[in-house]
Each structure stands twice: as structure tokens, then as C-alpha cells.
Amino acid sequence: MTEQRRSPHHPATRPPAPPGTSRRVRLPASALRPLVLAMAGLTVSAHAQYGATSAIPNIDLVEPVVTQTPEAPPPPAEGGDLVPRLTEPATRTAPSGNTLNLSPSSTPSNPNAPAYVSGDRVTGYSEKGVEMEGHAELRRDGGVIKGDRLTYDQDTDEAHATGNVRLSKSGTLAVGPEARMRVQANEGYMLSPDYYFQQTGGSGSAERVDFLDPDRSTLKKATYTTCSPDNADWYFSARKLDLDSDRQVGTAYGGVLNFFGVPIAGAPAFSFPLNGERRSGVLPPLFGYGSNSGADLTVPYYFNLAPNRDLTIYPRILTSRGVQLGEDFRYVGDGYSGRIRGEFLPDDKKAGRNRWAYSIQHYQSIIPGMTAYVNVSKVSDDKYPDDLTRSVSQSTLRQYTQEGGVIYAWQDWVFMARVQKFQTLLPSEPSYEREPQLNAKYNRYDFHGFDISLETDYTRFRIPLTSTGFQQPEGNRAFIQPTISYPIIHPGWYVTPKFIFNAAQYNMDAGTNTTGASNTLNRAIPTVSLDSGMTFERDAPGVSKLFGVKYTQTLEPRLFYVYTPFYDQSQFPLFDTVQSDFGYGQIFTENPFTGNDRIADNNKLTLGLTTRLIESETGVERFRGTIAQRVDFTGQRVQLNGTLPDAKPSYSDLLAATTIQLFRGYYLDAGIQWNPDQDKVNYSNVALAYRPESRKLINFGYRYRRPTSVTDNTAIDQIEMSGQWPITQRTYGIGRVAFDKSANQLVDALAGFEYAADCWVGRFVYQRFRNTSNGYTGRVFFQVEFRGLSKIGSNPLDMLRLNVPGYEPVTARPVPTTPYDHYE
């Protein structure tokens, strides 16, 4: 038996009036904007955009960036923009948002437009009056009035229609038993109208609508929904609506959002914009559950301070911890922009102390090409990310940046001066801070065939004591590194010789450098390299015959040689240098270290070979296979920590990788790092995906890394599975699990489902992940998305996109319509 749900369209089944004791929750402005169409002849100018104000922004404290200047702060992680992004002009006042963005029709009315009438029987009752019966119809200036009986007086421009009356204009249709209108003046009324908006799919009903003038109208006991008339799962109702298109504002009295007949949100009175402009008010609530904080409810309030400034306040109730207050202030102007965010939780019930976090970003244009910036973030204690942040990425942050600087770009030069400090949370050890760093870079490409670059840098490095009270080396470092190369590129082959010269000087603080080492250290090391490659192509008839598509196969050998003389750097500090991960990218570089404190000695030749299968007609790559190995003719003596005295000629691990997309819906990426001397696999990874169509996917991944040295002693043996798959026609399951075999423990997992009705989507997700305190954190996400209205609940979409590769959110499935539906 098919379930019959309440419809807001038929008078006999019109939703009841709002309960007298409605919850004081403000609905987004977009809830009522479609109603304007039926009253004031407005037209839809944009489609609905979901989720812009459905959730609060996180603090999003910025991770440290040691090699470049941070970019502008990102938009809120769990919602859309409340104001224009900071890189946009300050004159933009209508942000993308969760609105239908309705605006008056761009076509002005024509007071001299002729009127056309028709009917089964047409009778003139005066010189300019006419009466029609049976399929009566009046058309004027793009508007249509129909009814069983219709009278029209051309002198007064007044039309009176009774019996199955239909008013239509600009894609809006209203149906009722009676209407009286002064057509051109847009004054009159309609009784018991049911209305439909073609471009948005929204519809509703009212007891009466009064058109006061071209700009103002009033509805009594009005409803609105984007559901189909026979299954109105949700609808918005209001005791009274006052709409003023001249002021672009509407006021709702007794507004209630009903879901399956149950009032879930309401407000005694509130105003809303009619044209997408921002207005101050309460935003949809965000709620969820976390194992560290209990039930979590946030009700944001938005202040529209100015066209280029806004402030959002986030009162947050955590049942296990107390009441937290957050704020997010944004501003953008001519040559400057910024964002200030903060959170404060007084007297945390669990921790027994005040908890807080803040983040400040500011960007200021000084002169053309010169920008100053500040990027500062800090938290109150080491446990703050685990206890009070809202995402896995934030909960695992162990370092927060306090940085300020100036960048100047002039022709081929970029100059930078900055001070960079960090707040490092236990159990992580502190990082080196730059107090200050002065850097200049020059890049010139194709200067008479040469590519030229130059980098020079002076940095004062300081570091806090370690957790055990140990003082690491501190001092000043200055280096200069010119580079010149001459690429020779021809069809089918290329050769690129390159010369690099690195000169550096260290002035160490007394008593902090390696025991017995000088406080002044110098080095000057040249490097030469030669990179070369060729590309051969041929038809692949065997593969083409097998798959029924013409393929081209390539064969691409590559040789890379690098030579750097040995220079003992065992007494040099490690300020910003680490060992690069060995892989296909690193094996074709001049230095296996990242940073400027170690320059490896090289006498190495890398040999690589790649083959591809490419669809000849489309150019799509369906297969790639790569193999590479490096030959070290003398052995590398310079190590990250010290010098290897007995280095010998050797072969590197053999690298092999493949990417396969030959079969529709199947994707494979695999790689392996094999040590031929020990006959052992040092690293391997496999990623297999099956995606036959949209919102159908299964991912499998495996990663393995064997500890190979004292500095690389972290073992990885991890399996990951994730997917999204339809369970029924409207229900989709989502899941992920990651298990660490080496530690025999769960890394993270999530499970949930999405349900897509014709006018709403429901999402429920539970996530559990290992935190930095060697424990687990669990979170519950529950969200309902009302098509064309708003979202209520906690937003899991960003988390799902991050954890389930290829995930696509399900969307509501409205009943299909055609341009001729409701055509008049």
C-alpha cells in the first residue's frame, strides 16, 4: 500500500496553522523568496545553491609552510561563503549562498501593450468592457488570466475571474477559485491560490493573496515546498507574509518548517531579503556528537556589518564540557583583506581550565608588487585539537604558525622578508624558527636559450628546548645558489645540461654547535647534471584488435647523470633539511636532500624507461608502465647525520610503477621499490578502484614500507577499503576502514548512508579515528538537506570527500518536468 503524505496544495488537505509554541529557530532567507513570484510578477534569475549557510566555519588553524608564503585563508571548511572571498572585489555584495536569488524581471512592463481576450462566448457590455464565459482568457504584456468566467474593463484595466482561475506570468502559475486584478497596476487579490514556480520546481498554497501595489503584497496562511504535490515530505508555512520588492525585504509571521508533519524549526517573526543580499540573523543550527565532548549544538548568528565586512558568532553547547563561544570576522577592501577567528571555552568541565584558540590572517598591498601579511594561530594547550576541533585534519595538527612578512615581486625577481615561529604541541618536538629570513629569487627563462635562476638567503635559526630540556644548535646561515641550464628540445628527443653552484656560510651561537666544531662553517660545492630522453611511437595493432579501439604505443627511455664532489658536512647543523622520500621523482634530481644544509656527493646515473598506450583518436592514456634504477659509481658519503667513510659503488632500489585504465570502470595504480641485493621489497603500494558509474565505487588500497635505516625506522603495513554503493533505488551506503597490520590496530573507520527523496536528502555517518593521544575519537554526523531551502545538522561532505576517493554527494531527485508543464 502506497503511503499518502500530506500535500500543501489542496484546500482540503492544507497544512494546519503553526503551533502556538514554536521553537525560536530562524530559517534561511531562501525559504520564502519563491513566494514573491506569485505576488509581484518576479522571475527566477538563478538556481538554488545548497549549503552556503548550513554549517559554521571551523577555526582552520594554518599548518606551517616553511618554503613559501601562506596564501589567503580558506573559506569555511563546513559551509559556504557568507561574504565574498577575500580575493574578490569589495564591491561584490551578493555572495554565493543558499538562496534562490530571485530578482525582478529584466523586461519592463509595457503600459501600452494590447490586451487579447477569448472564450467560448464573448459579450461586450460597454464600449470598452467585455465578458467571457467558458475557457475565458485574457492575455496582456506576457501575463495570462484564465477562468470559467471573466470580465475585463479596458477603461479601468480591471479583470474579474471566477471558477478555476489561473494566473500565469514569467514561469509562475497560480490557481484559485476567484481573482480580481487591475492588470497593469498589479493590484488586486486572489482567493485560495495554489502556486507553482517552473524554474525552481517549488510550489505552495495560501488562504488569500492581496496585491497592494506593484511592489507590495501580502499572503495569509501561506506554504512552500519543492516536493511533489502528492508527497509533501516537508513544507514551510507562515501565518502571514508581507513582501516588499521595492525595499527587497520580506517579513514572515509565525513561520514553521514541517518535516513529515512534525514542526522542526520555527520563529514568531523574522525578515529576509528578496534579492540574495546578505542580512543579519540566525543561521541554520549545526549539531552532532563526539566521544570527547558529548552532544554538540551550535546556533550561529550572522551580522552583516557592511558590504565588505561581516561577523558570525558561534554559541556552542558541548554537554560534556560546557558552553563555548566562537567568532569569525571577515573583511576585504581596496588593497587589503583579512580574517580573525577565535574560540573560548571557560572552565572546561573535563579539563578544569579555560580553553581557547585563535587565528589571524591579514594581507596588505603596500605598493604595486609589494604585499605584507600576518598569519598567526595558536591554541591554549596540547589537547585542544583532540578535544574541541571538528575534523580529523584539525585534530591531528601538532604545529601552529605565527608568521609575518613582506613579499615584493619586481620583473624576474621575488624578494621576501619574514619572521616565522611555531607553537608545537606534545608529543611532537619543536621545529626551527626563522628570526628573521631574508630571501631573494631570480628566474629568467629562455634567455638566448638559457634558463637562469638565482636564490640567495639569510636566516637566523632559533629553536626552543626539546621536551627533555636539550638545547639544539642555533645560528645564522647565508647561502647563494645560481643555476644555469640549456634545454635542447626537438621532436622525439631532448637534452638538458645544467650547472648548479651552492655556497653557504654558518655562524653558530657559541656552545650550541656539535662538540669540537667551529662556530664558523663554510662550503662551496658545484654540481653538474645532464638530463636526456627520447620518445618512440608506433601503432599497437594487437591491443587495438583486442579492445576494438585504435591505440598508439610509446617507448620513452630517459638517462640522467649528476656529478657533485664530496665535501664533509658532518659538523654542519640541520636547520631545515630532511631526507627526501626515495621515489621516481627523487631519483631524477641533483640532491637527495630537501633543504639547504646538505649537498650530497654524486657520481650517479639514473636509467628510466616508460611505455604508454594512448587512444589514437582521443589522446586518453589507458596504460602507463615505468621502471627506473640509479647506479652510484663511487658511493654517497654525505649522509643526513654524519659521513659514511666506507661508501662503495652500488645500485639503488629498483622502482617500478603502473597505471591501468583499459577496462571501463576499473582503475589500477601500483608501485614497488625492490632491493636487488637483499631481495626484499622496501616499499609497495596498490590502489584499485571500481567505478562503473556515478555514485557507484569501491576502492581498495594497500601500503607497505620496511624500515631501511636508523633515520627511516617507521614501518607501514596498512590496508584501506572504502566505497559508495546504492542499497536501494534511493538509499546509498558509504564506508571506509583503514587497518594497520604492523601495529594490529584500527587507524580509522566510518560508516553511514544517504537517502535521496524527491525534495530532500538525509545523511547519517559515524566516524572513528585514532587521535594523537593514542586513543580513539568518535563522531556522529546527521544532516537533512531540503532542496531549494537549506541544510540542518552537521555537514559530513568534506570528511567523506577526504576519506572516500571519488565520493559524490547524492542529490534530491525531483519529479521530471518539461518546458510545457503548466504552460498557459
Curated annotation (Swiss-Prot):
Where does this one sit in the cell? Cell outer membrane
The task this protein performs is described as: Together with LptE, is involved in the assembly of lipopolysaccharide (LPS) at the surface of the outer membrane.
Membrane as a keyword of this entry, yes or no, is: yes
Q: Does the keyword Nucleotide-binding apply?
A: no
Family label: Belongs to the LptD family.
Q: Spell out the Low complexity composition-biased ranges.
A: 98-115
Which HAMAP family does the protein's record reference? LPS_assembly_LptD
Record's protein name: LPS-assembly protein LptD
Query: Which residues, if any, are the signal sequence?
Result: 1-48
Name the segments for region: Disordered. Answer: 1-26, 67-117
Alphabetical UniProt keywords = Cell outer membrane, Membrane, Signal
Q: How does it assemble?
A: Component of the lipopolysaccharide transport and assembly complex. Interacts with LptE and LptA.
- What is an annotated GO biological process for this record, any one? Gram-negative-bacterium-type cell outer membrane assembly
Q: Pfam families, per this entry?
A: LptD (PF04453)
The UniProt entry's GO CC annotations, sorted and at most eight, read: cell outer membrane; transporter complex
